[in-house]
Amino acid sequence: MNSRERKLSRLAFRFGLLGLFGHLIGLVFASLGFNDFNGQGFSFYNVTLSELGQYGHSGLAVVFNGGLFFGSLSLVLFCLFALQICDNPWLYPCLFLSILALLALAITGLFPINVYHLHTLGVEYFFHFAALSVASYLVYLLQQSYVDKRFSGQGSLILCLLSLVIFG
């Protein structure tokens, strides 16, 4: 790995962490500050994630939607930088589909559930592109069966199958 690839790798890693941090901060602050009409706090059993970003319903909707939007754009930059230093052509479809899934997630954060048709369109395309991305990564893992790292390959294979069940 030369110095250019090392710099791109470091930059991609930092943008990826920044994006994950943005998603996490938005989710934590919005869920801690959430109160519904009955005075109840946030619960995954009673409230959807989209309701955290609904203006007029959630006091910290701006934080949640901003974290979702800017975190997704930061993760898009991570995928673009990873695409430049990718050494295996089997990973190109996975990264490209991940970019499309993250752009759909950014659209979901840009248009809250108050703009219902655009919000649901973003959510729908996110699930489609994320499932296709995971499926293409599964193809990459299956064609890499000769890799020495058997444990990480099997763990990634199990996680891919689990996420296909969830997204599919």
Predicted features and spans:
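Membrane-interface helix-boundary motifs at transmembrane edges
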Residues: 6-7, 80-93, 142-152
